[in-house]
Amino acid sequence: MKIGIDTFGCDHGKSGLGSYISYFVSNLPSDLVQFNKEATTINADTEPTVEDALDKKLKIKVELFGIEEDRYVYNSGQAINYTSTPMIENLKAERLWHNTKITKFIKKNNYDVVIYPAASRVLPVKFKNHLGVAIINSILSNDLENESSSFRKMILKGLKNIQIIIASSNFVRNDLIKLGLEEKKIKVIHSGIDHKLFYQRLDLDNDIVDVKPFAIKRPYFVYGSSLSSPEKKHIELIHAFERFKKNTGLPHRLVLAGNDGPYAEEIHKVAFNSEYASDIFLIGFFPHESFAKLYAGAEACLFPSVNEGVGLPILEAMACGIPVLCSDKGALKEIGGNAPIYFDSDNPDQIASCMQKIVEDKDLRDSCISDSVIWANEFNWENTVRQTLNLIINAHK
């Protein structure tokens, strides 16, 4: 079996879509090798797994394809082949290629299966002579809101015609069903987190957390999310922080890490005008790999966003051994389980109360940390990759 992974629409690896590909490829079983059709056949009466396929000498080759500029972006050391195609580098050209030339490209490269990680952005409408697998890691109804009517119709037509859709959470799956997509072909496979990067650090006893280019004085709360919309609830969190400071008189700071977006000006204004402006830090874009140390040094991770389809940041914070206080909306309760303390993001007083409890109640804090580390350990990329391959092998039998 030859599986192609489409890298178009993944922002040269600099977004969550690109990270998905990098982690997926780097966690492929090391003994997956080039497919040999004469090696064996899969028993149609069973539901085979990756282990079954390898035991029967069914050989699987995984290959990436996209523009030449991305040839080394997703290089994981796994010696995964990359096939490039000439392309003008813009989303419009990529979308046109997917609906005029990809069928011929797939046939030429003998792909039995194609995985589309950026299915909400670039996707064919027909899937001739191959098994298509769409990955949806966000709330599609939100993604399509600001797109043209013709593009919305094209993406939905592609998703209606594709054989398999993998949703990152039940919340995302339910959103897809509301858009009219067939329930039985939508499977939920949670994404993993990088446990080599996000893990509990027990040696952080300094008053200053040095995370280049910042040196952040402890104690602090951290919220990592782009300043992109009211649904991220930055302003409500700032108001909650103000109440926490008034109620406790404690020296805590609030660190807001994330790119400026359409809502940034309003958030900056509220922070600047706050009575506690000197304790509120908006540090802008923060490299993903630097979040591990930022989380590890924090009093707690706050995550008030109400429309998250995945919620990986709360898992990453849990894995770092800090309590998580987050919204009870979106996919967060599904992803967080019983480990976080949940709140109503529209209620700053409730958020402030949760912040105070996690600071003052040592038993509660210790319990949250213990539960968080155990829970986060269940989310790993090895499981994500194997579940995905098992689904593909079974569908392709």
Please give the residue ranges for each predicted region:
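Carbohydrate transferase catalytic cores enriched for Leloir-type hexosyltransferases
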Residues: 1-397
